[in-house]
Amino acid sequence: MYQVGVDIGGTNIAMGLVDEALDVVQRESMPFEIKGGGERTAEIIHEGTLAMLKSQGAGLYDLDSVGVVVPGSIDPAGSIVINAYNLNFHNELLKARIQKQFGDIPVFLANDADGAALAELHKGAFVGCRTAVLFTLGTGVGGGLILGGRMFHGGLGNGCELGHALLVSGGEQCTCGNKGCIEAYCSATAIIRDAIRAMEKQPDSLLFERTMGKPERMNAKIAIDCARDGDSAALEVFHNYVDHL
């Protein structure tokens, strides 16, 4: 029997088919369609799952469960995405939508950093740990906390979510509507923003050359590659990023 793990990100939905030994035997990645909302997201998860199962000569009858994680706050019952700003999900009944696609197959919904920490606890760097913390750095910033060998969710289900804690008073605009959040400085989104600014200030930089000076062409990979190649503008972006982190 198999299980499916799904990571809904700000740009892609990453999926993995897991066997009984908890080893990933097949992967799938599909674009996240922000305009499609929760309903289209559930359809994409179903389509990707069928494709992975088919690659193994299997079908839904071989599927034990579906685990889905999102970069946002989940209600204590694990049913509703209260807020996931980078997905434009607000009080989204995501579990019910996904459950509708899979019928009687159990569906579980959790915060992405909590899911990552739990995975490390069972088969990763946290095996045998009683206390551990994990931070996810991507489109946003998330955190997962293990206390006493168990996942800590907190009274409101936010657990160790620090992405929207205040870092710089009156600072950069965040996707949540506030200013100065950790996420506004320590995410891939922040790297792209700062790389564009650096590129515009230094037209002789690799950042400018590799994007042809067009902001819409900038992404985190270009910024990282330029920094690795010694571009002073890109290195300054990452020095600031690390300082804030």
Kindly give the residue locations of the regions a language model identified.
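Short glycine-rich, Thr/Ser-proximal phosphate-binding strand/loop in the N-terminal lobe
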Residues: 2-43, 47, 80-83, 157
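Short glycine-aspartate micro-motif
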Residues: 3-7, 62-67, 108, 132-136, ...
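Glycine-rich phosphate-binding loop plus the immediately following alpha-helix
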Residues: 13, 109-113, 167-203
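A mobile "lid/hinge" subdomain adjacent to the ATP/sugar-phosphate binding pocket shared
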Residues: 18, 185-244
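Glycine-rich phosphate-binding loop and adjoining helix at the ATP-binding site
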Residues: 38-46, 50, 61-66, 72-131
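Glycine-rich phosphate-binding loop of actin/hexokinase-like ATP-binding domains
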Residues: 127-185
